[in-house]
Amino acid sequence: MQTKELLKLVENVLDERKGQSISVLDVIGKTSITDYMVVVTATSERHAKSLADYVLIAVKENGLIPLGIEGQQGSDWVLLDLGDVILHVMTAQSREFYQLEKL
């Protein structure tokens, strides 16, 4: 799967599952670890886990294996490393506190 296809898949799953304020950050040339970071707001910790789980299922159904997952159990920030795309699922409070888009 090409990077743009993966990015679109992630965005579609997040939108279908009611992720809020989906932001795609193009970090090509700014970091060597990924091409895109996706930041999305979840309505609760349970919703954050659910969003990450649905993306994980969709990615696996397309033959990809995630490189890493952090913060799945009772966390206000779940990180899913898909290689060329890194997904940050955060509650509104965490997103406001960390302000990843401003880095």
Label the predicted regions.
Residues 61-69:
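Active-site phosphate-binding and catalytic loops of NTP-dependent enzymes
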Residues 1-29, 43-50, 57, 70-71, ...:
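Long, contiguous binding/interaction regions
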Residues 32-35, 81-84:
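A short, glycine/Asx- and small/polar-enriched loop/turn
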Residues 39-41:
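Short hydrophobic/aromatic beta-strand micro-patches
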